[in-house]
Amino acid sequence: MEILRWKIRISVLWLFMAVAMSTHSVLAFMEREVVEQMWEMEMGPGMMLFMAIFWWVPLVMAVLSVTLKDLANRWINMILGIVFTVLNIFHLTEHLAHPSAHQILIIGSTVVVTALIFWYALKWPKQET
């Protein structure tokens, strides 16, 4: 039962990550400067694919976190927790150049959430016998 509780915690954190990224995008489209920048830059298929994968992975991980076996679950959550923490820190630093409180709050929360995913996976309890 203890293991299931850890799996659900991590799964909920991945869902939070996906919802926060959706919120970030919606709020970004409400900022005039962001919309103007988007019209000026060209977003190719590679960038669109990267963004889709960046959204898709947390949703897949929410499902895998409750279905994978313990060892695989622990390792994939540690690895992706670190990867997404680093990516979110990079994303946060980009927004610090032109800060808006709501974006800093949302992106900052994704840094904390992905760090917690790593932490929970690292502290995964021993299998009960």
Language-model features: where?
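Membrane-interfacial loop-to-transmembrane alpha-helix junctions, especially the N-terminal start
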Residues: 73-80, 129
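Core segments of alpha-helical transmembrane spans in multipass integral membrane proteins
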Residues: 15-31, 39-68, 78-86, 115
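Alpha-helical transmembrane segments of polytopic membrane proteins
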Residues: 47-55, 91, 104-111
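Hydrophobic/aromatic positions within or immediately flanking transmembrane alpha-helices
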Residues: 14, 74-77, 107
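Membrane-water interface at the C-terminal end of transmembrane alpha helices
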Residues: 112-129
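Membrane-helix boundary connector in multi-pass membrane proteins
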Residues: 73, 86-106, 125
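Low-complexity, Ser/Thr/Pro-rich intrinsically disordered linker/stalk segments at domain junctions
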Residues: 3-6, 64, 105-112
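Cytosolic juxtamembrane helix and N-cap/initiation of the first transmembrane helix
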Residues: 1-19
